[in-house]
Structure formats: structure tokens, C-alpha cells
């Protein structure tokens, strides 16, 4: 295999990014030097390890997984694993950093020449869902293990995650400004409601089932843009919680 060969379809494999090109390079732990476009045997082996580590983290959860579990699943000796990474936490970091970096990188590339806010939102939703539908184990790891990293590793991943969230919020703000609506949903609510719709598909969506990815994207986009009861008069959507209703605790003594 040529060291310079690009994969035929990067959406079908776990993409390898520049693990050494960190914004806080002076503070980050030393990681293997791997150019993002050089698919050498070294790159492919680490990719293989990360893909299997993500699957095991998704199945057992991060804290219940040991490096020995990953060694057995990959057929790579413990000494071999530590040749590629220093710890289990570093594996988790590489998975999270790679995912956020890749999905953000592709999104920014696709949005580069797009001006219409609604088109930007459709691209955002399609980019997010199509990526994670192809990487369901990684999506579960991102959702469940968001706080499992600590220190500089957590800070580094959180920086990319925050950038991604701010981009979604900015697109929604542009849509609000374009529509000039007098009654507007709070931007924070809208942003996290959108991610809530997209991020939990690993609980129910089957990429091999009847609902294809393109149909999933279309349904989520329509639901977010138009609502479940599209066409219902606005006056019927007015709702105010009853005054005086107390929060309900699961513990009776707290009610």
C-alpha cells in the first residue's frame, strides 16, 4: 500500500486526523506523529485500535473497560498498545478529539460558500447525522463519556465541542434575524433541542434498517424547521404553565 494513498471513501472508515497538531501543543501529552493524509501501516494500526476501543467503550462504558479488554479485542499485545498510546484515557481522548475535529472540519468546508441561513442549517443537520450514523459507537462514547476526560485533555476536546455548538447557535440566530419573527424561541433552548434530536439516534436508529440516512436527515430537518403539527394556527400553540404548580420530586418527602 502506498504511504500517500487516500482512502476511496473516507465516510466509510474511521478518519485519521493530525493527532500532533494541537492548539496547546506545549501542554498536551506527546502523541504519535502521524500526518493526516499518510495512510501508512502505523496510521492504520492506530485507527484499528481506536475503532475497536470506541466499540468496547460503547458496549461496556469507559470506566469498566481495561487495556487488557482492548488488547484481546484487537489482538494487539499490551506492550503494542502502549507503543501507540500511553493510557486508556489517551485512547478516549484520541477518539473524542478525532470525532469532533473531523465532523467540524467537514462542516466548515461544506459551509464555506453558503450564505443562506436555512441552507446552512440543512447542511449542519445532514453533516451531523450522516457522520454519526456511520460512527454509532463513537457517537455513544461522545455522549456518555463527555466528562470522563480530565485536565488538559478535557479542556482541549471541550474547546472543539464549544466551537461546534457556537456554530450551530450562530446559524439559528441568522435564521431568526432573517425571519424577523416577533415571537422567537430562546436560542439556547433551540440549540440544545436540535442537538437533543440528533445526538440520541444511537439509542434507536438502525443504519441497516428501512429508514435510510437520507430519510432520517429529511425527517429531522422537517421536524425541527416546521414542527410536528405543521400548519396548526399560532394561537393554538400559545401555552403557559399553570401558576403555582410545584416541581414534582421522585421522593415523596420532597414534594
Language-model features: locations:
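Hydrophobic alpha-helical connector segments
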Residues: 109-134, 191-194
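Amphipathic alpha-helical packing segments from all-alpha helical-bundle domains
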Residues: 101-104, 108, 152-178, 188-192, ...
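Helix-turn-helix
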Residues: 35, 48, 56-90, 94
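Amphipathic alpha-helical linker/stalk segments
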Residues: 36, 95-122
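Short, hydrophobic secondary-structure boundary micro-motifs
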Residues: 140-143, 184, 235-237
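C-terminal peripheral helix-coil segments that are non-catalytic and often amphipathic
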Residues: 3-34, 130, 134, 166-174, ...
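Generic hydrophobic, amphipathic alpha-helix propensity
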Residues: 45-54, 70, 91, 95-103, ...
Amino acid at each position: 500500500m502506498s504511504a500517500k494513498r487516500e482512502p476511496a471513501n473516507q465516510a466509510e472508515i474511521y478518519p485519521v486526523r493530525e493527532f500532533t497538531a494541537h492548539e496547546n501543543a506545549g501542554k498536551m501529552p506527546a502523541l504519535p506523529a502521524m500526518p493526516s493524509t499518510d495512510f501508512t501501516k502505523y496510521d492504520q494500526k492506530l485507527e484499528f485500535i481506536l475503532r475497536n476501543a470506541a466499540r468496547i467503550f460503547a458496549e461496556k462504558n469507559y470506566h469498566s473497560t481495561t487495556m487488557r479488554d482492548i488488547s484481546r479485542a484487537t489482538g494487539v499485545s499490551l506492550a503494542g498498545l502502549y507503543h501507540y498510546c500511553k493510557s486508556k484515557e489517551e485512547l478516549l481522548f484520541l477518539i473524542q478529539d478525532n470525532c469532533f475535529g473531523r465532523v467540524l472540519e467537514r462542516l466548515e468546508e461544506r459551509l464555506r460558500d453558503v450564505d443562506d441561513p436555512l441552507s446552512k442549517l440543512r447542511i449542519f443537520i445532514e453533516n451531523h447525522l450522516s457522520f454519526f450514523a456511520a460512527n454509532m459507537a463513537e457517537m455513544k462514547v461522545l455522549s456518555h463519556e463527555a466528562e470522563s476526560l480530565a485536565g488538559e485533555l478535557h479542556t482541549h476536546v471541550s474547546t472543539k465541542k464549544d466551537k461546534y455548538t457556537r456554530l450551530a447557535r450562530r446559524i439559528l440566530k441568522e435564521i431568526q434575524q432573517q425571519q424577523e419573527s416577533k415571537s422567537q424561541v430562546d436560542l439556547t433552548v433551540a440549540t440544545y433541542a436540535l442537538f437533543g434530536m440528533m445526538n440520541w439516534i444511537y439509542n434507536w436508529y438502525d443504519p441497516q434498517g428501512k429508514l435510510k440516512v437520507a430519510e432520517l436527515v429529511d425527517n429531522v430537518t422537517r421536524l425541527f424547521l416546521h414542527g410536528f403539527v405543521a400548519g396548526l394556527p399560532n394561537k393554538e400553540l400559545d401555552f403557559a404553565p399553570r401558576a403555582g404548580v410545584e416541581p414534582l420530586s421522585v421522593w415523596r418527602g420532597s414534594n
